[in-house]
Amino acid sequence: MTLLQPFSALLLCLSLMMATSLLTTDKPEEKMYSCPIIQCSAPAVNGLPGRDGRDGPKGEKGDPGEGLRGLQGLPGKAGPQGLKGEVGPQGEKGQKGERGIAVTDDLHRQITDLEAKIRVLEDDLSRYKKALSLKDFVNVGKKMFVSTGKKYNFEKGKSLCAKAGSVLASPRNEAENTALKDLIDPSSQAYIGISDAQTEGRFMYLSGGPLTYSNWKPGEPNNHKNEDCAVIEDSGKWNDLDCSNSNIFIICEL
């Protein structure tokens, strides 16, 4: 339907009204019929939809929903250690324990035997100390130099000290060298626990390792006639010597 149709209907209605009025002038006795404009018009047509209105104000917060409860989450990390709590009250006294096992007679006998052996060792040690006091010895630092009072060659002197659980004396500093020379008789010599038998001209300690201290006489060591051993003289100076020389004092080191 076009927009001209309503107007056409209106014009038609007006025309009918005019025609009716003309008819009434000729026949007054007849009843007059009229056609209202509204009733005679064609049906109205719906217009286009209007624009959306503006959003209204925000509503109030609704009540919590009543959905299903979710699963429990994983445990969180352990928190920091709390402060030490106060000491609790003292507990009740416990029951009396069982009687301990008595020490057997066999254990008593073992203890008695050990005590007797200790007394024997103490007596022996006392005698050894007295015997040692009759010999020449000197303490220096943590060392003790003991003169055997005997003269041997190098190998026999080394063996003698080893039997006593010691080694041939070998001073490692000036203080030890001075203490060692004080044990030597005038115009005498004592073997030192060093040798260059393994490498000529390179003296080593018998226990291994190069020398950390020496006090050689001027021009020594000179390796005269295969002199692989060394001695300390009463002056404190060192000299290389033939190891087979048996006229040398033996001084041990503890």
Swiss-Prot record:
Key words of the record: Calcium, Collagen, Complement activation lectin pathway, Complement pathway, Disulfide bond, Glycoprotein, Hydroxylation, Immunity, Innate immunity, Lectin, Mannose-binding, Repeat, Secreted, Signal
Modified residues (4-hydroxyproline): P57, P75
UniProt signal peptide: 1-19
Subcellular location: Secreted
Entry GO terms, CC: collagen trimer; extracellular region; extracellular space; multivesicular body
GO biological process, one term: complement activation, lectin pathway
Modified residues (5-hydroxylysine): K58, K61, K93, K96
Function: Calcium-dependent lectin involved in innate immune defense. Binds mannose, fucose and N-acetylglucosamine on different microorganisms and activates the lectin complement pathway.
Protein name: Mannose-binding protein
Domain C-type lectin, first and last residues per copy: 140-250
